[in-house]
Amino acid sequence: MSTYEHVIVGAGIIGLTTAFELVRRGVDPQRIALVDPAPASGATNVAGGMLAPAAEVQYRQEPLYPLMLQSAELYPSLVADLVAAAPGTDVGYRTESTFVVAADRADATHLRELTEHQHTHGMDVDRLTLRQARSQEPGLSPQLAGVVEIPGDHQVNPRMFAAALLRVLEYKGVRLVREKAGALLWEGSACVGVEVGVDKRKVLGATTYVCNGLGARALGLPLNLRPVRGDMLRLGAANAPVGRVIRAFVEDRPVYIIPRTDGTIAVGATSREDARERPAVDGVYTLLRDAIRVVPALEDCELIEALVGNRPGTPDDLPYLGLGGENLVVSTGYFRHGILLAALGARVGADLGLRRTTAVDIAACGPARHE
């Protein structure tokens, strides 16, 4: 049996940023435990990493907009503090603007309507001519039907970011419990920790945080989580054909192309709810075809890796973020927005775990809303 002040179940991007936020606020790192059999893996390992509150706008998801905007605004200081804790660390944080392009006339109509919707919500989105766009990104196809630029949408490399967080937390003394979490432990109405491993060893904490994505389904909480699989590709090129994130609509299908600081290019992502646990052939084919239609030179790249991740979806696409009981903080169900919302999720989680009032309006994200 081990006892800590803060026990965080899950060491993906949400758990890692929550632990780092606690350390930033002066919590003794040795009083924090992260419970995860494979830290910095899972959906984090397959994520795109786009910090794109404007481009991620979806119709009828208004409660998400302010959360995404606030979280994106927190990223510069979060990255700066992480790099300060480990000088020389590269987390793949890039601040070039994002281009969103349309492949044909129907896509251009959709892009125009989406841009009007974004403007309605006060988002900074600028229309460009194709000539203007190709003067900055000559790798774009000359056959595109429309382009907009979003100055405030940036990116981080999820693998590098998570690895850096893990290194810093370990160096500072955060305890890693590399075992699978079992049941939560309760004394009356208060959560007092979690069982881990096959021997059901107790890891006790004054506050317990549920940050383990789909794994939260096994903890006995009333969370309506479902796996939404996403196929993603990693390409290699001696010289990247684009220098910023390119998002596109191709016959109404979304695709993104993300050049990384490590020389790779991420292409994604499908969204499917089926039984195929490995990358789907139709998904890989469609991603490559659509990406090459937008940036033709991608056909000269090497295919390094095809991946599939399980994203934790909820019925309304909002995360479960809030108190799940006495001494229990729930922070999961981030679906496609885990990387983007990690900074805000960490701030709210730390606020709640330290018994402070959070300034973030999370009324729509209550963990018990789907009971």
Language-model regions, residue ranges each:
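N-terminal Rossmann-like FAD-binding beta1-loop-alpha1 element of flavoenzymes
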Residues: 4-33
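Short hydrophobic core segments
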Residues: 7-9, 35, 202-215, 346
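Conserved Rossmann-like nucleotide-cofactor binding loop
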Residues: 14, 40, 215
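Active-site substrate-recognition segment that forms the wall
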Residues: 20-27, 37, 49-50, 55, ...
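Dinucleotide-binding Rossmann-like beta1-alpha1 core, especially the glycine-rich loop
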Residues: 50-132, 292
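Helix-loop-beta segment of a Rossmann-like dinucleotide-binding subdomain
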Residues: 88-102, 114, 121, 126-172, ...
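Helical element adjacent to the flavin cofactor pocket in flavoenzyme catalytic cores
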Residues: 147-191, 195-198, 207
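C-terminal catalytic lobe of FAD-dependent flavoproteins
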Residues: 297-371
